[in-house]
């Protein structure tokens, strides 16, 4: 019996070597594009709608510039500093990633070429810088931002990416679990953004007191792109179209929905009104919290993580922030400390608690090395579970230290050449002073509702001063002052 001929389109060829999985390559390119769309146009229009009208162009342009600048630097030197051969214990050797021979080789993970991996990792690096921008909107000198982006990418992002994600990184070898960037992207951007906001200084007092979004519907459109784009963000990190990719996507959306609802319920309980801005904040904290765990935890754990991510960052933002002199001093425009640093740290710790050994073996290919404390106790491997929690905590401390130090040094270096902050006169004007352009051909800042009682419209950090009371199961009163 003669053999059935193999379809010609599936035969190996110069453009399709035997090691290449066309399905995995196609999904990886699509996942990268989804992540890219989270930034362009997702965060561009989210920032453009969330800020005061006079800052819409500047906020959007900071994001667009960062995306382009990161891409340029990434292919010239930054990718191989993050994932290449070891230069120092925490760093890879800088080198071009543009040569055909290098681009067509199989990537260090996955059945696709280096070119695909470079693209995928680039959009992750780009969104990290754009998230940092959220902390300094409304006053950072654009020329300082133009310098900040390549410097921070080179001397901070590559450092943490190599240590945590590279196969040669010391935390990767120890066994840290950061499935899709809770540490490398979100904790880094939250800490770096808060640190940069400290050095740049605050917005004008009147802008800090009243900073209403100029277009809530536009902000919601950006938030929707951000949420749906997370399908590629977490679904692309198994580097294949397998079972763990499906689980990661489902867990991502389950956690996010739970977090959003939790945040909205807390707003209703304590502020008596559901807030659109609050819902977006809850959405973001849910997305961030599940990121380090998406493909390595069970669905029920994702729901629990959503409850935590919708409540703990809410409490730190609405209560602790207002009572802390340090937190009040630093003007973090988009609250990235809470939505990214705290939510990312929370996700990392909960990953150390709920990481399921079988799911980790699907992702890492190693069984019983990555064991959450919850399962470690069940399996009589409590010491392994405690070790995992310890590694997760060590990763948090490492990322905080690296980003505080590197971001501070970069800001101090930049201000030797250009001011970090715009002048008071230019901040009064906004986009017209910074770029000679305006977003809308209308007068005023859209501040018609001066008596608005939204807890988010006047300032992102309002104290919970009007106590809301609810009865607990025993009939006593629970108050939040």
From Swiss-Prot:
Q: Which GO terms describe its cellular component?
A: plasma membrane
Q: Where in the cell is it found?
A: Cell membrane
Pfam families attached to this UniProt entry: Ammonium_transp (PF00909)
Q: Supply the alphabetized keyword list.
A: Ammonia transport, Cell membrane, Glycoprotein, Membrane, Transmembrane, Transmembrane helix, Transport
Keyword Manganese on this protein?
no
Task: Please give the residue ranges for the topological domain Extracellular.
Answer: 1-28, 80-116, 163-180, 237-250, 297-299, 355-393
Q: What is this protein called?
A: Ammonium transporter 2 member 5
Organism equals Medicago truncatula
């Amino acid at each position: 019996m003669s053999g059935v001929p193999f379809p010609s389109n599936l035969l190996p060829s110069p453009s399709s070597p035997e090691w290449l999985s066309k399905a995995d390559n196609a999904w990886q390119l699509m996942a990268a594009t989804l992540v890219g769309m989270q930034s362009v146009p997702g965060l561009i229009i989210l920032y453009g709608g969330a800020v005061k009208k006079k800052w819409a162009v500047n906020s959007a342009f900071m994001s667009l510039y960062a995306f382009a600048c990161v891409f340029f630097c990434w292919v010239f030197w930054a990718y191989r500093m993050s994932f290449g051969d070891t230069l120092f214990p925490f760093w890879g050797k800088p080198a071009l990633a543009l040569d055909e021979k290098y681009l067509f080789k199989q990537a260090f993970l996955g059945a696709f070429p280096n070119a695909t991996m470079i693209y995928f990792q680039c959009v992750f690096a780009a969104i990290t810088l754009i998230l940092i921008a959220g902390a300094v909107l409304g006053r950072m000198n654009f020329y300082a931002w133009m310098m900040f982006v390549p410097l921070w990418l080179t001397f901070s992002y590559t450092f943490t990416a190599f240590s945590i994600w590279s196969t040669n990184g010391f935390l990767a070898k120890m066994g840290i679990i950061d499935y899709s960037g809770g540490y490398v992207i979100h904790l880094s951007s939250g800490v770096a953004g808060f640190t940069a906001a400290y050095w740049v200084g605050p917005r004008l007092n009147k802008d800090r007191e009243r900073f209403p979004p100029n277009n809530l519907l536009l902000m919601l459109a950006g938030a929707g792109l951000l949420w749906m784009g997370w399908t590629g963000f977490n679904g692309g990190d198994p580097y294949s179209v397998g079972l763990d990719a499906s689980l990661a996507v489902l867990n991502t959306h389950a956690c996010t929905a739970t977090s959003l609802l939790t945040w909205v319920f807390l707003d209703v309980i304590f502020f008596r009104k559901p807030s659109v801005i609050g819902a977006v904040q809850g959405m973001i904290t849910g997305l961030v919290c599940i990121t380090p765990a998406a493909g390595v935890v069970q669905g029920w754990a994702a729901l629990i993580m959503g409850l935590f991510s919708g409540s703990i960052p809410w409490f730190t933002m609405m209560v602790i922030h207002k009572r802390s002199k340090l937190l009040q001093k630093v003007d973090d425009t988009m609250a990235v400390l809470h939505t990214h640093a705290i939510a990312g740290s929370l996700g990392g710790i909960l990953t150390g608690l709920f990481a399921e050994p079988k799911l980790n073996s699907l992702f890492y290919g190693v069984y019983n090395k990555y064991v959450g404390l919850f399962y470690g106790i069940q399996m009589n491997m409590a010491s392994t579970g405690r070790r995992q929690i310890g590694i997760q905590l060590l990763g948090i401390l490492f990322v905080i230290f690296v980003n505080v130090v590197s971001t501070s040094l970069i800001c101090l270096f930049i201000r030797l050449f250009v001011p970090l902050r715009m002048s008071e006169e230019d901040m009064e004007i906004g986009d017209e002073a910074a770029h000679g352009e305006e977003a809308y051909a209308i007068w005023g800042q859209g501040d018609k509702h001066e008596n608005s009682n939204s807890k988010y419209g006047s300032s992102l950090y309002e104290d919970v001063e009007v106590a809301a009371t609810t009865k607990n199961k025993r009939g006593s009163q629970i108050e939040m002052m």
